Amino acid sequence: MAFLATALPSAPVQFTGRHVVSISDFSRNDLIHVLELATRMESSQSPARLDGKLMATLFFEPSTRTRLSFEAAMHKLGGKVIGFSDAGSTSTKKGESLADTIRMVERYADVIVMRHPRDGAARLASEISTVPVINGGDGGNQHPSQTFLDLYTIAKLFPELLSGERELTIAFAGDLRYGRTVHSLLTALCHFKVRLLLVAPRGLEMPDQYLHAAVKAGLVVQEIPTLQEVVAQSDILYMTRLQEERFPDPLEFDHIKHSYRITAAMLVGAPPHLRILHPLPRVNEIAVDVDATPHAHYFAQAGNGIPVRQALLSLVMGAV
Amino acid sequence: MSLEPLDPPTSSNPRVRQVEAILHGTVIDHIPGHMTLKVANLLARENDQVSIGMNLRSARMGRKGVVKISGRELDARTLSRLALIAPSASVSIIRDTKVVQKFIVPMPKLFEDIARCANPNCVTNHERWTSRMEVINADPLTVCCIYCERNFPATELVLL
């Protein structure tokens, strides 16, 4: 991939046995190391194999992309998968603690991929488990493998992200307060040269702690009132889903949801290189007519989940 | 008596003590006025003899609180709890009416099992697990839960 040639040389990075809990735990070198390996995975240039290894997927909350892509990644590497995708069918329902579940599963599997509704659940699991824990989403907190694939997608589209030859303009739109993907991605982008544009309804703005971190890292951050304004000036428009339950007044939600919806008509005159990303699932915030435009990149983004998760699994299990 | 006066001495009344002196024990001084009762509640055990001074004049703070506990010196855990709710307070250890040690409440790098995370969805509020919060800013005291990664002003936390 072109972006590899422009990435800064990375120092040796130790990943074997490491937990993947929060994107904050990873240095710039770590991030680049994962992206480099994902590139080799995608082009089938990596010899990494996980034959005879077992991955446990503990999904205490529903998931489509994360679970399926981790499972697909493990199968592609020759490993096997056990797990559940409904906590209702497990001993959790009988009152088993998360700690006890982990103490049991670590004896069954070589790696644990976990999604849990509580913020911080993956960190707790990582303090107990002797096998690597990969966080597949903990409440509204973190979703690091999504961030790795978001970064991978951006770096494939715009190698300047890693080379620093040009400051990329990346816009986040939608629910920036509760959306864990934008929090994690912002944290990762603090390692790069980026101008951030933020578009959010009142009450759903990016929390101060992330804004402060971005500014401290030297990112230029601007809050922009409308979606149309960012379309004209962005390289990446990262959309997130607005959730009705965040709005006390259903009428307000009804009004707001139209202001945070992108349509093909709004993209007429957009820069040709603009790409729209979304962690999916989308509901109303991206009109179906956008799919046919060259700006739509969210399904390709989801596809990048496979090589990125292959890379993460191989790294934490010491296959590379 | 060798205890330091709580107020700056004045020419008319150089050594007026606003809260009764103690023979042995601990004096917590320079407590922000509104936190005085909270500090007393935090420190006092059922049978402790506690003297409280509220809204006392202070050259440094304008108004302050003082809590004196007879017969007991504070352990490390209690000092950590004190650091969370009154980080600017000073502590004097009294033995035979003499101040044998005086220090500002030490600020730990990590509050462990001292306060409940203010995020209701934090895993530490739902599992039997120790809460741990890192200090990320001393003034105003701000902590970050190492589990849910949220930052909170210390004033939002509930002590355990």
What kind of region is each of these model predictions?
Chain B
Residues M1-S12, R150-L160:
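N-terminal charge/polar-biased segments
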Residues T97-L160:
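Cys/His-clustered metal-coordination modules, chiefly Zn-binding fingers
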Residues S2-F103:
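Interaction interfaces in information-processing and related assembly proteins
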